[in-house]
Every structure is written in structure tokens, then in C-alpha cells.
Amino acid sequence: MTTMFFNLLLAFMVALMGVYIYREHLMSTLLCLEGMMLSIFIMVSLTLLHHHLNSTMMFPLILLVFSACEAGVGLALLVKTSNSYGTDYIDNLNLLQC
């Protein structure tokens, strides 16, 4: 394993640990999820470039599209909870159920 892949794996693990530690606050969780998606995107892109897999070069782009959708839904939930309750605690998300 090269140093770059080790650093990206370490960045993913730190972001995963951040999701676990800051799971009460939605904003911190969203930032950690974005860090995880960014490290996965870079790892997938570098792996595809390293192995010269030109037929699968659309996978990183698809991953970015899903990451943008995840960020949009997360920010919509953040705006809804902060406008309704004045805080970004995830415990308030149970109150949004129909």
C-alpha cells in the first residue's frame, strides 16, 4: 500500500470517527460525511487511474453526483431543524416524522 492510499484511508477513518464522536450535531456529522465521500472519491479515482481502467471512469462522477444529493438533503434537514427548533441536534429529527 502506498503512502497516498494509507493517508486517504486514514482520512476516511478520522472522518468516520468524527461521525461517531459528533453524532449529536447534524452540521458536524454532515461535514464528516463529506470528508468520507471526498476520501472515497479520491481513492476510487486513483485506483482507476493506477490500473488504467478507462471503461469505468464514470464511477467517480457517479459518486460525486450521489455525494451532492446527500449534501443537499442533509442541508435541507439542517435548515428545517434550525428554523423550527433553533438548534442542530439530531434528537430533534424524530419530531419531523409524519
Swiss-Prot record:
Coiled coil: none annotated. Its main location: mitochondrion. One of its GO terms (cellular component) is mitochondrial inner membrane. It is found in: Mitochondrion inner membrane. It catalyses: a ubiquinone + NADH + 5 H(+)(in) = a ubiquinol + NAD(+) + 4 H(+)(out). Keywords: Electron transport, Membrane, Mitochondrion, Mitochondrion inner membrane, NAD, Respiratory chain, Translocase, Transmembrane, Transmembrane helix, Transport, Ubiquinone. It comes from Zaglossus bruijni. Its EC number is 7.1.1.2. The chain crosses the membrane at residues 1-21, 29-49, 59-79. Core subunit of respiratory chain NADH dehydrogenase (Complex I) which is composed of 45 different subunits. This is NADH-ubiquinone oxidoreductase chain 4L. Core subunit of the mitochondrial membrane respiratory chain NADH dehydrogenase (Complex I) which catalyzes electron transfer from NADH through the respiratory chain, using ubiquinone as an electron acceptor. Part of the enzyme membrane arm which is embedded in the lipid bilayer and involved in proton translocation. Pfam families: Oxidored_q2. Belongs to the complex I subunit 4L family. GO terms for biological process: ATP synthesis coupled electron transport. One of its GO terms (molecular function) is NADH dehydrogenase (ubiquinone) activity. It is a multi-pass membrane protein. InterPro entries: NADH_UbQ_OxRdtase_chain4L/K, NUOK/Mnh_C1-like.
